[in-house]
Amino acid sequence: MIGEMRTPETISTAVTAAETGHLVLSTLHTNNASQTIDRIIDSFPGDQQDQIRTQLSSSLLGIFSQRLVPRIAGGLIPAYELLLNNNAVANLIREKRTHEIDVVIETGMEQGMVDLNHSLLELVRAGEISIENAYQFSLNPKGLERLI
């Protein structure tokens, strides 16, 4: 367990450990899976980014991102996004197309992936959060509107 990956050295150590078969869990302050991948890659100098892309594409198992949303009954509840690495995700990472990962998450729900808007919608339907808070915490309010 790595508290937070803030430096290239920490990230490199984590990726190397994952490549050798160790389960590595860590935190990073980002809003979603594509931002997480971009933050990891962007922490390296330009001449090392292709290498970390390749390593990350083959060693990453998944990314769990959460946003804490105010509950109707008080307190907070997590709305989340879950990205599971597969061939499509690995290719997008290697090909510098992480901006397309949201589409893979939306189409990968049968594989167990969850996009933030579906998580928010389920919380609204369960009476846990208000629709207003769902829109406020969505990273794609127009996409949420299409689901409702």
Predicted region positions:
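Short, flexible helix-loop junctions that flank or precede catalytic/ligand sites
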Residues: 1-148
